[in-house]
Design a protein with these regions (language model features):
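ATP/Mg2+-dependent ligation/transfer catalytic cores
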Residues: 1-151
Length: 151
């Protein structure tokens, strides 16, 4: 296990000395502050299958803690026009800490996250690609007793 961490290509894993599935908000904040990271990028898949991005300049710790805890509101009717109507389209993209990585293409030091969709009540959005895939994987495991390692 130590070799997996020491030789890991993700700078967050090697710096924090823990596997990515154990990352916490406090770990991410520590890395951001000590490495002087300037931006966050929230990445999420829209209904059309395209990867979208929301970028945030880190202005202060309070804002950083809020955005990592609560995510950001997005208009679901633009992202999932087939499923959501403009009147009831509040969604939140919440970062999954275990997906954090340094963006190798950004000129500004940036940490990117893959995000999950949640509704205004804090429940996962059932029509999101991630949720559908998760449910399919659970059904597959229940029937076959096998699981997908890529997930």
């Amino acid at each position: 296990m130590k070799d997996d961490i020491a030789l890991n290509i993700n700078p967050l894993v090697s710096y924090l000395k823990k596997p990515k599935n154990e990352f916490t908000k406090a770990d991410i904040i520590k890395f951001i502050e000590e490495k002087e990271i300037k931006m966050l990028a929230f990445r999420y898949v829209a209904g059309d299958g395209k990867l979208k991005s929301l970028n945030f300049v880190i202005t202060n710790r309070e804002h950083l803690e809020q955005i990592l805890s609560c995510g950001e509101r997005v208009d679901g009717s633009n992202i999932f026009p087939a499923f959501m109507h403009a009147g009831s389209s509040d969604l939140y993209v919440i970062p999954r800490f275990n997906t954090a990585f340094m963006d190798p293409f950004s000129e500004i030091p940036t940490i990117s996250f893959l995000c999950s969709y949640f509704n205004k009540d804090g429940q996962p959005m059932e029509n999101s690609p991630e949720y559908i895939l998760k449910k399919a994987a659970e059904s597959f495991k229940k029937v076959t007793n096998m699981s997908f390692q890529a997930m």
